[in-house]
Amino acid sequence: MSKSVVIAEKPSVARDIARVLKCDKKGNGYLEGSKYIVTWALGHLVTLADPESYDVKYKKWNLEDLPMLPERLKLTVIKQTGKQFNAVKSQLLRKDVNEIIVATDAGREGELVARWIIDKVKLNKPIKRLWISSVTDKAIKDGFANLKPGKAYDNLYASAVARSEADWYIGLNATRALTTRFNAQLNCGRVQTPTVAMIASREDEIKNFKAQTYYGIEAQTMEKLKLTWQDANGNSRSFNKEKIDGIVKRLDKQNATVVEIDKKQKKSFSPGLYDLTELQRDANKKFGYSAKETLNIMQKLYEQHKVLTYPRTDSRYISSDIVGTLPERLKACGVGEYRPFAHKVLQKPIKPNKSFVDDSKVSDHHAIIPTEGYVNFSAFTDKERKIYDLVVKRFLAVLFPAFEYEQLTLRTKVGNETFIARGKTILHAGWKEVYENRFEDDDVTDDVKEQLLPHIEKGDTLAVKLIMQTSGQTKAPARFNEATLLSAMENPTKYMDTQNKQLADTLKSTGGLGTVATRADIIDKLFNSFLIEKRGKDIHITSKGRQLLDLVPEELKSPTLTGEWEQKLEAIAKGKLKKEVFISEMKNYTKEIVSEIKSSDKKYKHDNISTKSCPDCGKPMLEVNGKKGKMLVCQDRECGHRKNVSRTTNARCPQCKKKLELRGEGAGQIFACKCGYREKLSTFQERRKKESGNKADKRDVQKYMKQQNKEEEPLNNPFAEALKKLKFD
């Protein structure tokens, strides 16, 4: 009897699919049943070959050998996961296998994971596609009942290959050219370089900003009501101090007369459902989680706990076919503190509306929402619980009615000047009930603060107790943090000085810099390359980042190019552009970049040389700020030696509760805090043992410390090997 091989992206998903398909016979890297063989990748098992596989001369980095432009790029098996590749290959080549089912993540990168394996094996068997947004048993069963022909995703695969090959041609050539020309470990890319340029531009704005003092007037009545002055245009601020002084002097000892009471009933609707970027922004603002950390937590909630849908989505809407599943999802997530809210929604039929249901705004995947799967909070970590809470509350809020309130604006005259006061009466809490009325709109910046207004009629006279001048200073633009940088990458036109409407529309339609699936990795790479650094929550550009922008070709710094390329990749995915045409353009562009770098007469200056010498080659070490602390890195890119000097941990200072920094090596390591607190590692171990009731041994503490320095990386990404060899520092 013939069988079908199912290729999943990860072992955990493979196990779930195998259980549903009753594949319980364990083999070497696969699970088998009567009809199906389920095997798995580990992220990417296959990637584009290194330059040296085309010509041995590319083993050495020489400027004169550039650009490297092989006619066709070859595929190679990633060394670390070669064993699993062979396991998958042996199943694909079985004579009793007549069909392949691609069950990797439903998206461009997932398509690439499976198709590259199939291409490398040189297989010519029919392909079908499983395309699902959650990995619950129901979703898997429904997906297998509605398998799509593999040919329907050929263009998506072509687009994924085009993106990867473009990054190979441009990324590897530009990086080698910069590094060899300027004798420094420099790397650039079509997304990361414009991102660094935006950070630099924001720092320039801050540096050039000159604060101005502005003035206003506030009147206080005997009833402790605060009235705010407004000019004829409704402005409550003026840069003319003399004008404000004159008004204050003129109005002294005058009372206020109520000339108008404006009552308006208003509604505000819940913010939309989460896509990945919006969730990463909120998690950073509320909990300080990095974009990468949030994505990793979401992956666990999706794959391991199966309580949330596919995370790498760029849609904030659900499609109409999902509406019928909402009651089951509400029952599943409506436990514990969410029970009363879910119960309330289920009392009436759910009325879908365009604020959260829109087929035209859902492409590959709908918004992140709860699944119909059972929720076991005791299995969640604290971080998983917090991310789950964000998603469920937003899901419930969208299904609740609007927040309704009556806004009262009191307009008074003091002399011939206008003063106003505002108040709000809540008529119906609506969706804010889910947030216990604590949800605040970040965009509210009105000078006129809402207050509790006494009962007042038009024509009433209010005795003014005090009239005084107020003042403040204009603020410089805020530095980027991870939340605001994600916003900037999603909509870079807001941070660009461009009059080109077509360019702005292109960037908007292509989703900005990077994709929801890649932005977290891009930000992480910028930290690890020491092009940017964190100071507190703020992101600063480093000297290395500044110099890189001065050395790279101008076009690479602008989001324009990325926007145009993303548009073309989208056209390939839709079958409107041939991959070969795009790659030909990329090769020509690579030639231009390399030529420009070669002819540059600029120099790179290391301004972070330490007094330490490299233990491997004896050259000076560079002191850099990594994402998690200070590091020493060898100046020689060929050597690549690096070591940690200090790192920020999750251990908290017993005095001020801030995160402690771990400095030094071995038994001499010491915890240090900005408040001045110091503690030896051995003392910390003893204290932790006591705090845990003498249950923690030295091994537990070492495990805890190891966890602080652990980065949860994807199992493999397509350029892991290549990038490692490039020694991006």
UniProtKB/Swiss-Prot annotation:
Domain Toprim: 3-136
Swiss-Prot/TrEMBL GO biological process terms: DNA recombination; DNA repair; DNA topological change
Residues at which Mg(2+) binds: 9, 105
A GO MF label: magnesium ion binding
SMART domains: TOP1Ac (SM00437), TOP1Bc (SM00436), TOPRIM (SM00493)
SUPFAM superfamilies in UniProt: Prokaryotic type I DNA topoisomerase (SSF56712)
Keywords: DNA-binding, Isomerase, Magnesium, Metal-binding, Topoisomerase
Cofactor: Mg(2+)
Ranges for region Disordered: 686-719
Compositionally biased spans, kind Basic and acidic residues: 686-713
Family that this chain belongs to: Belongs to the type IA topoisomerase family.
Database matches in PANTHER family: DNA TOPOISOMERASE 3-ALPHA, PROKARYOTIC DNA TOPOISOMERASE
Annotated function: Releases the supercoiling and torsional tension of DNA, which is introduced during the DNA replication and transcription, by transiently cleaving and rejoining one strand of the DNA duplex. Introduces a single-strand break via transesterification at a target site in duplex DNA. The scissile phosphodiester is attacked by the catalytic tyrosine of the enzyme, resulting in the formation of a DNA-(5'-phosphotyrosyl)-enzyme intermediate and the expulsion of a 3'-OH DNA strand. The free DNA strand then undergoes passage around the unbroken strand, thus removing DNA supercoils.
Record-given protein name: DNA topoisomerase 3
Organism of provenance: Bacillus cereus (strain ATCC 14579 / DSM 31 / CCUG 7414 / JCM 2152 / NBRC 15305 / NCIMB 9373 / NCTC 2599 / NRRL B-3711)
Higher taxonomy: Bacteria, Bacillati, Bacillota, Bacilli, Bacillales
Gene: topB
